[in-house]
């Protein structure tokens, strides 16, 4: 386990780690969506795309993973690290689990639909950062 990450967390009994991973991926998917929407709106407002991709990932409010995803967006190269279709699966599992536990996940449900539509457009086997390509309409 140590070679896979910087820190190994003991979450609890069997299955709790998978549950935690599902939660983290739901947060990751939603963070990718807001990052992409922010870049796209900034461009529509006349801000330079390279400026946005250089500055936003370094803001205190940005998730650290956006630095790597910014480069994918810049190069329009979505070589898979974590497939969009797997992100959709994790969002589906998270929203299903939320339903079963009577806990609404309004934004995760919306994210699930966006990732499903991107998958239908043929982006499923690309990295989940390809959601940017879907939101941009360049397919």
Describe the function of each predicted region.
Residues 16-138:
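Helical "substrate-binding/catalytic lid" subdomain
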Residues 1-14, 64-70:
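Acidic-glycine-rich active-site phosphate/pyrophosphate-binding loop
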């Amino acid at each position: 386990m140590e070679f896979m990450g910087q820190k190994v967390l003991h979450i609890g009994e069997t299955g709790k780690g998978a549950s935690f991973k599902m939660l983290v991926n739901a947060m990751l998917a939603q963070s990718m969506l807001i990052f992409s929407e922010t870049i796209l709106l900034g461009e529509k407002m006349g801000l330079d795309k390279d400026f946005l991709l250089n500055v936003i990932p370094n803001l205190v409010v940005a998730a650290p993973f956006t630095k790597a995803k910014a480069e994918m967006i810049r190069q329009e190269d979505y070589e898979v690290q974590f497939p969009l279709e797997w992100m959709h699966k994790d969002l589906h599992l998270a929203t299903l689990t939320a339903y079963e536990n009577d806990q609404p996940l309004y934004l995760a449900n919306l994210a699930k639909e966006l990732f499903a539509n991107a998958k239908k457009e043929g982006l499923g086997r690309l990295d989940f950062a390809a959601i940017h390509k879907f939101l941009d309409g360049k397919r």
